[in-house]
Amino acid sequence: RKLSKRKDPEAAVTYYAEEGYPQESVNEYLMTLANSNFEDWRRMNKTEPIEKFPFNLKKMSVSGALFDIVKLTDVSKNVISLMPAKKVFELSYAWAKEYQPQLAELFAQDEAKATAILNIDREGKKPRKDIAKWSDVLDYVSYMYDETFVPNYELNGNATSALAVKVIEEYIKVVNLDD
């Protein structure tokens, strides 16, 4: 169905600012709609600026594009995963000052700590893709701050306490903390 500005909050441009989709992510997503070969180019040129893409009018679809928020979110995860932690900190902190005061307060306490948290598993071959928009950051970092950590020891699904104990006992035998 078509998006409705009354029924669908994502029909308003302000929605994307409030959710914290980075401008870079929106640009990447729009380019996937505009040129059919952009995604192939991006796979081959992961760190190249979008401006280096050889845009070709002949590669534009003749039919109108359909908006896909799931695709935007996926593109955004990829874009953010390639950002240095310092940039993720700066952009998410600036966003939080306006839209999520609790995150802004946590980050203001210790910027170096916040940047270090955001750098966890960011610089390897396969950086983590947990953050799709800045509104995801508080949940992502919450376990690192006493003010936001909520312990949860409930087992999910069909797991029993006996199974959990067995998994931990077996895991202890093979885990290498030096990895």
Task: For each feature predicted by the language model, list its residue ranges.
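Catalytic adenosine-cofactor/nucleotide-binding cores of aminoacyl-tRNA synthetases and other
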Residues: R1-V165, E169
